[in-house]
Amino acid sequence: MFKCKNFNYAVFGNPINHSKSPEIHSLFSKQTGISHFYKSCNVPLNSLYAVLQDFFKKDGRGANITAPFKQEAYFFCNKLTKRAEVAQSVNTLKKIDNCNILGDNTDGIGLLSDLIRLNFIKKNYSILIIGAGGAARGVLFPLLSYGCSICIFNRTVLNAEKLVLQFHKYGNINVFNTNSLHVKSFDLIINATSHFIQDKDNFIPFSCVSSKTCFYDMNYQTDNTFFFDWSRKTGSNFFSNGIGMLVFQAAHSFFLWHNVLPEIDYIIDLLNK
């Protein structure tokens, strides 16, 4: 049976080789002086439950969950934070005792924290989110709670409609319709897809953006991406990748486990080099 052992904290996903989480948590450990043995584990598909059970039965104290397991991890937990319960998606687990695993979702607070750091967001901002998958699901509740209005653009409209139905009680959220042009340009556009939509004939009209629109890619590649190239064509100079979100969500996971929130900014600068 697949096993992870000899450490207390881990990130589970498939694939996982690209993960920067072990590096980030190593920096947190050195900074805070908290012993924090953290590794990455590639989990075979359909094996998450068995892997997590084995991990927590041994020395496991906390775990991060990445694609494609966040919604599956939600059902593994028997206690949930409010934001995890609303998102129905979990990226952080904490062992409370031998019988209870707490599930949290720090993706949304991670994104919101980075947007505030960048001065990319204000209350009442109009936000367009590209994508209606797990990445979008995890961030909607904090953005709506902050007071922003959200439109979701997704090629499969039904998936966007499902998210709107799930989250409409928490704020102003709608499906973006390219046939009904937005009168006012968006203040912020967030790419929540792993592969940015490249079909120019089936995308967002430039009438919906301005030179003041901010662009945020939840992916954290430092090289130019299609989303980056598209944002530049709008005339905007406000663009960021998702490195800051990655570090902030990791910091909030660390806080859940140790009740200490690490310093953030220098780690973001380090990873962006």
Curated annotation (Swiss-Prot):
It catalyses: shikimate + NADP(+) = 3-dehydroshikimate + NADPH + H(+). The keyword NADP applies. Its EC number is 1.1.1.25. Shikimate binds at residues 19-21, 66, 91, 107, 220. The active site is at residue 70. GO terms for cellular component: cytosol. Coiled coil: none annotated. Involved in the biosynthesis of the chorismate, which leads to the biosynthesis of aromatic amino acids. Catalyzes the reversible NADPH linked reduction of 3-dehydroshikimate (DHSA) to yield shikimate (SA). PANTHER family: BIFUNCTIONAL 3-DEHYDROQUINATE DEHYDRATASE_SHIKIMATE DEHYDROGENASE, CHLOROPLASTIC (PTHR21089:SF1), SHIKIMATE DEHYDROGENASE (PTHR21089). This is Shikimate dehydrogenase (NADP(+)). The lineage of its organism: Bacteria, Pseudomonadati, Pseudomonadota, Gammaproteobacteria, Enterobacterales. The gene is aroE.
